[in-house]
């Protein structure tokens, strides 16, 4: 097996096994292709369903964990008996092919298996974490990253990934924000669609494509206190206007599976939530793929307190619309009895099994159940690594650059100190959810900097801390000495990958351990200090931001993060990432996000009073009286959409094509963008809108468009956006989507804090 006997032997075994399987099945496949040529997809589904026994139907609704390299007798027997429709976590291609052989050749009807895996942001070649990919604001690179991941995963026989994770999250304490696409529904929707397209390709039956799974449906990212699995309470209006939008975009992009969330939504756990999966997903959106539970979440309905036992949990999940159970046997154990008792109609089971079979047919599994890695692109090929590098490059956000400290110049410096626990950490830079990521492929920042400038200047390296959480500071004196002897210092700080992801929420999201103390000690040397931060979430950086000259926020950048960071530090490229989530000043500001409501008492700079400026005996109503915190104000440390460049971009002359448009019409909004700096660079131009008066209160700003443009020094271009009145639609009091006539403000700029604004009016043509 791969990883035990070595890649060469594994390749020989794989080819031999596959060749034998292909010889045995080629004639059968040819006959099957001819027989199915004149049948439509639905006819094929219906015909197969008509041949199935009830036990075989229930088997298709059962997914089994098959992570052991050795195939046990119980699994062989279950697949051969038609009691398994899908396996997950088996990544040895020989084992996968053998399990497919059992399903195709030994089961009565020969129905192939879905093979699932969490391929979240890469397989062997790892892209930046999804939150980092969202910082690219580039659907093309996100799509291609998913495409690379699909091709690599397919070499292991995987045909289904549990991605993209598209939960909106406004709470950086939540560990799974690392897997998300940020806080904004417009940006998340655009990138969700791109990921689905990347995984699934133009035709699911093509070799190297895999089924995508949009998760977690729905509201999981709004967990109370940012604690994973915690309760979520989201009013239906907000649910529809914010949290459901990326899922609708994924469905519109053709995603074939969804995963129900673990969490309790408004009193009903998502796994048992008929409103979500039948009313919204099926009836309103017309989804015809299938829904899978999260790991053992059917059984957990009883733990929530929604049901009394496993049997009632199965009843609730099936009635709600969960087509397949992941990693549990409750469906196998209970469904037949529930049907026999007349509580669940077999017609409902038929419809659910049809959803699963439909995806198997779409994937072409009946024609091509086996995997031959030789038919697919090589793992970690040049294109894959270049895609990972470009994604990392575009994901890094320049938060701060006082006095133009960056980029560093190898010509002007004689030496540079690289200090910190994450400068040379090949595993940590990959981020969370990298079951299959290959650390041998990782190029760390320290090695990349040596490669880029080591021949021109003296590069000195000290880890200084064992890991990001270390409290011992015995190496700090040595770090200070190295810093004093160097012309500039690059600190690699942040959090290890294990501190984010599922079940890894944090109450304090500042730099862990003694990192802030390390920053303070290095600052005292008086040398220019650049902080490069690797993390799986936005962090509160208030305690270090004034002690460093520049900050590059690199997320967990993946396999090629090192070369990307080195290129940015030394000016080979200019940073172009923009924040997909707000950075709070203090954790107590959470949830903090740019598209909040105005309230009846909106804060402004002249209404904010700091806690230290209040007299001890001041009367209660003598100050403020607006929505802010006494100790943090109301603004974030860094706003959504923020990201600096080595170029200087100037926005001016915002215009609309008409001051008034009718419902159903399109408006052109444009502004001039000038590069007044000395270097060519890319900028993400952002369009925001505010609906001033509406059926329900609306956000103070909403992202409605973005474009990534490259501009040479001294050049000016006009950037325009088309804005249709449908783009202004929202769900009102009656939960119906509508666009209302009225006055709108519109902004164009480089972040959500842009002040370049004009306005227009929408009128009812009637």
Feature-to-residue mapping (PLM):
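Surface-exposed, short loops/turns at beta-strand junctions within beta-sandwich domains
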Residues: 737-739
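Glycoside hydrolase catalytic-domain context in secreted enzymes
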Residues: 20-725, 729, 741-752, 759, ...
């Amino acid at each position: 097996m791969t990883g035990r006997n070595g890649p060469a032997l594994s390749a020989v075994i794989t080819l031999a096994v596959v060749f034998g399987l292909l010889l045995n099945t080629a004639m059968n496949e040819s006959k099957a292709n001819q027989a199915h040529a004149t049948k439509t997809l639905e006819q094929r589904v219906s015909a197969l369903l008509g041949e199935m026994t009830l036990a075989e139907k229930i088997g298709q609704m059962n997914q089994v964990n098959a992570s052991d390299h050795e195939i046990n007798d119980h699994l062989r027997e279950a697949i051969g008996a038609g009691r398994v429709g899908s396996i997950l976590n088996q990544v040895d291609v020989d084992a996968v092919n053998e399990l497919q052989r059992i399903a195709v050749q030994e089961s009565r009807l020969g129905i192939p298996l879905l093979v699932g895996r969490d391929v979240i942001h890469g397989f062997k070649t790892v892209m930046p974490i999804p939150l980092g990919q969202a910082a690219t604001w580039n659907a093309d690179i996100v799509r291609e990253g998913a495409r690379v991941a699909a091709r690599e995963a397919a070499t292991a026989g995987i045909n289904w990934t549990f991605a993209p994770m598209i939960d909106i999250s406004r709470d950086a304490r939540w560990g799974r924000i690392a897997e998300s696409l940020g806080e904004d529904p417009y940006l998340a929707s655009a990138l969700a669609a791109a990921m689905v397209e990347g995984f699934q390709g133009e035709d699911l039956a093509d070799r190297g494509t895999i089924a995508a799974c949009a998760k977690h449906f729905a509201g999981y990212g709004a967990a109370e206190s940012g604690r994973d699995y915690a309760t979520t309470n989201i009013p239906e209006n907000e649910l529809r206007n914010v949290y459901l939008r990326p899922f609708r975009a994924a469905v519109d992009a053709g995603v074939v599976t969804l995963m129900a969330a673990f969490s309790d939504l408004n009193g009903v756990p998502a796994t048992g939530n008929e409103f979500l999966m039948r009313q919204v997903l099926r009836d309103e959106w017309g989804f015809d793929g299938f829904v899978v539970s999260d790991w053992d979440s059917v059984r957990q309905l009883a733990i929530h307190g929604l049901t009394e036992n496993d049997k009632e949990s199965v009843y609730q999940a099936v009635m709600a619309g969960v087509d397949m159970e992941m990693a549990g046997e409750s469906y196998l154990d209970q469904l037949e009895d529930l049907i026999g008792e007349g509580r669940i109609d077999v017609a409902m089971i038929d419809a659910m099994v049809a959803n699963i079979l439909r995806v198997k047919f779409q994937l072409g599994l009946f024609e091509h159940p086996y995997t031959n890695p030789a038919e697919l692109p090589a793992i970690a090929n040049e294109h894959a690594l270049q895609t990972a590098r470009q994604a990392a490059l575009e994901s890094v956000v320049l938060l701060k650059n006082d006095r133009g400290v960056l980029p560093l110049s190898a010509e002007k410096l004689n030496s540079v100190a690289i200090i910190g626990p994450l400068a040379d950490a090949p595993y940590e830079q990959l981020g969370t959810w990298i079951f299959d990521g290959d650390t041998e492929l990782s190029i760390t920042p320290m090695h990349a900097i040596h490669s880029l400038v080591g021949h021109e200047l003296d590069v000195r390296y000290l880890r200084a801390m064992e890991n990001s959480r270390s409290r011992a500071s015995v190496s700090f004196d040595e770090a200070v000495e190295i810093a004093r002897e160097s012309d500039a210092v690059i600190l690699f700080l942040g959090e290890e990958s294990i501190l984010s992801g599922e079940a890894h929420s944090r109450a304090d999201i500042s730099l862990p351990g003694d990192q802030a103390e390390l920053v303070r000690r290095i600052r005292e040397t008086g040398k220019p200090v650049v902080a490069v931060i690797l993390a799986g979430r936005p962090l509160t950086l208030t305690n270090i931001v004034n002690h460093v000259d520049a900050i590059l926020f690199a997320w967990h950048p993946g396999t090629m993060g090192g070369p990307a960071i080195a290129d940015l530090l030394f000016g080979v490229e200019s940073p172009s990432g923009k924040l997909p989530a707000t950075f709070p000043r203090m954790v107590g500001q959470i949830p903090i996000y740019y598209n909040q409501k105005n309230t009846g008492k909106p804060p402004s700079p002249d209404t904010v009073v700091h806690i230290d400026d209040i007299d001890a005996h001041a009367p209660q109503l003598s100050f403020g009286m607006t929505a802010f915190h006494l100790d943090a104000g109301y603004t974030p440390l860094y706003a959504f959409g923020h990201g600096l460049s080595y170029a200087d971009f100037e926005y001016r002359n915002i215009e609309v094509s008409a001051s008034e448009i009718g419902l159903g019409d399109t408006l052109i909004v444009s502004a001039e963008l000038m590069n007044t700096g000395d270097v060519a660079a890319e900028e993400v131009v952002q369009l925001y809108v505010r609906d001033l008066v509406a059926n329900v209160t609306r956000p103070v700003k909403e992202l409605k468009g973005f474009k990534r443009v490259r501009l040479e020094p001294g050049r000016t271009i006009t950037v325009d956006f088309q804005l249709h009145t449908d783009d202004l639609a929202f769900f009102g009091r009656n939960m119906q989507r509508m666009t209302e006539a009225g006055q709108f403000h519109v902004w164009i700029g480089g972040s959500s804090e842009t002040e370049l604004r004009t306005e227009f009016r929408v009128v009812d043509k009637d």
